[in-house]
Amino acid sequence: MPGLRMAYRIWGPADGRPLVALHGGTGSGESWAALAAALRATTRTYAPDLRGYGATGPADAYSLELVRDDVRGLLDALALTRVTVLGHSSGAVAAHLLARASPDRVAALVLVEPPPPVPLGLRLPPRPAGPLPYDWAAREAVVAELNAPPPTWWEELTEITAPTLVVAGGPASHLPQHELARMAARIPAARLVTVEAGHAVPAARPAELATVVRDFLAALPG
């Protein structure tokens, strides 16, 4: 993350299992406070404000591959050699890109309502009036990327080696749930669960999400 000063929050004990949580398109690191509190007995959660968001602030360019690289830089800066990576929405895309590009750094992967790497036809609403806690250009860039994802993103799902949990939000989500199922089936060591919450699973059902994440982590070796 050359030239980018990245803000982040930490919750949980120093000897807990390290988990890096990546927020979605209108969130921030603070979006993970409830989940981190539910997991704090065994998990140390690191939650950055991604480029263009919160205290990290605007950047010169935006893409999910840049976010992936920022997160890898954060792991280096914090001397985190191998972690669980959890992402919601666009943060989940950055998470699976990291797992594919740096398998040695990702011990496990949790994808919460990940936009499938197929053209989605998402429509960005008009920019809200007044100051925003994020750079609107970041939202525009990410939505454009999700609507026209590189074909390699779909192809490379088969190369993810980390144990993976895909959390779908059910029929109330705007994402096509059958595509999430296809996505999960394409990742070799993935399983799919549904938390009936729509797209905003972390905000709408944090306790239920914490339970499925805790159970997933508890079943991992080591």
Regions found by a protein language model. Name each.
Residues 144-186, 194-196, 200-202, 206:
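Conserved serine/cysteine hydrolase catalytic core
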Residues 31-33, 56-61, 121-122, 177-178:
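Conserved catalytic-core motifs of eukaryotic protein kinase domains, centered on the activation segment
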Residues 66-83:
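Conserved acidic catalytic loop of the alpha/beta-hydrolase fold
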Residues 81-118:
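Conserved hydrolase catalytic core segment
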Residues 112-159, 175-178:
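Helical cap/lid subdomains and adjacent loops of hydrolase enzymes that gate the active-site channel
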Residues 7-57:
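Conserved HGGG/HGGXW glycine-rich cap/lid loop of the alpha/beta-hydrolase fold
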Residues 1-5:
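N-terminal cap/lid segment of alpha/beta-hydrolase-fold proteins
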